[in-house]
Design a protein with these regions (language model features):
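Conserved Rossmann-fold NAD(P)-dependent oxidoreductase catalytic core, especially the SDR/UDP-sugar
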Residues: 79-123
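Flexible, glycine-rich beta-alpha linker
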Residues: 102, 125, 142-167
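NAD(P)H-binding glycine-rich loop region in Rossmannoid oxidoreductase-like domains
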Residues: 29-72
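Rossmann-fold cofactor-recognition segment
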Residues: 16-34
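C-terminal substrate-binding subdomain of Rossmann-fold SDR/epimerase-dehydratase oxidoreductases
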Residues: 187-279
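Alpha-helical substrate-binding/gating segment
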Residues: 157-174, 179-206
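Catalytic helix-loop patch of NAD(P)-dependent Rossmann-fold dehydrogenases
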Residues: 71, 107-145
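Glycine-rich NAD(P)-binding loop of the Rossmann-fold in SDR/ketoreductase-type enzymes
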Residues: 27-30, 51, 68-76, 120, ...
Length: 279
């Protein structure tokens, strides 16, 4: 919200949780009636919205039961997508997840770096919902050729306060193997949302959103060879280059990570903290 407002967008935050005041409206997104009413206009003086950023969800597996996670997240996304269509809103950006890529990679990925080109491999109820949301968006865009839905497959979201823990990950390469040692700084995640909103291309598309580097001080090539020795590495990797490919987001959305945990944590080994990150 702060990033969008800082870049000149007028934003209304519709959620069950928030601080009272201008720009926030409390809505239960599992209630379709509340959602569609809000999207037509929060009050008589407000005539609706140009676009929607849908981030409301139980944010990870194992926070609630599988059934509660499925019911909440699937219903919320259907309500938002359907209400947007009814309200004539033709641009939706929403949070999908890296989990559809096959996390925790107990079965190795088909290749490294992983990208958006291979079929989803959900391995939890949470990631199953994310996959079903993408499939729902594909069909809604087929029904309505003017609709634009962008799924951002966010990596593990981190804030600056989290970075002091990162050097400890080097003690065990397997500790963060579950998402190929990836992360996304919340500020760069906000940038990706903004770039997706400002991109015009009707239809459905999906993008991995991660930072340019890994959470590790060890080289990406060394990690891949040690933990996934039989998996094809499809390119020459930069020293700490992410194994969650962000090439598509860079190419199409103009997304470019501006932050790295290495600027906030004790000094680590390696001369190039974000190799693979264009200057």
């Amino acid at each position: 919200v702060a990033d969008l407002r800082a870049h000149g967008h007028e934003v209304t935050n519709i959620d069950q949780v928030g601080e009272r005041g201008s720009g926030y409206v409390r809505v239960d997104t599992t209630d379709y009636g509340q959602v569609v009413d809000a999207l037509f206009g929060v009050q008589d003086l407000h005539d609706g919205f140009d676009a929607i950023v849908h981030l409301a969800a139980i944010p990870a597996p194992a926070i609630l039961s599988d059934v509660a996670t499925f019911h909440n997240n699937m219903l919320t996304s259907f309500n938002v997508f359907q209400a947007a269509r009814r309200a004539g809103i033709r641009k939706i950006v929403y949070a999908s997840s890296e989990t559809v890529l096959g996390l925790p990679f107990d079965v190795p990925p088909p290749y490294i770096p992983v990208d958006e080109e291979y079929p989803a491999q959900p391995n939890s109820t949470y990631s199953l919902v994310k996959h079903l949301e993408e499939q729902m968006a594909i069909e809604l865009c087929r029904w309505d050729p003017e609709l634009q839905v962008t799924a951002l497959r966010f990596s593990n979201v981190m804030d600056v306060d989290d970075y002091e823990e990162f050097p400890g990950y080097d003690d065990d390469a397997l500790a963060r193997k579950w998402n190929l040692w990836g992360y996304i700084d919340g500020r760069d995640g906000a940038q990706a949302v903004r770039k997706a909103l400002e991109h015009d291309a009707p239809g459905f598309d999906r993008f991995i959103v991660a930072n340019a580097d890994t959470v590790m001080s060890r080289s990406s090539a060394e990690l891949a060879a040690e933990v996934f020795p039989g998996v094809e590495v499809t390119k020459e990797l930069g020293e700490h280059e992410t194994l969650l490919s962000i090439d598509k987001a860079r190419r199409i959305l103009g997304y470019e990570p501006e932050h790295t945990w290495r600027d906030h944590a004790p000094a680590t080994t390696g001369d190039d903290p974000v190799a693979g990150h264009p200057s």
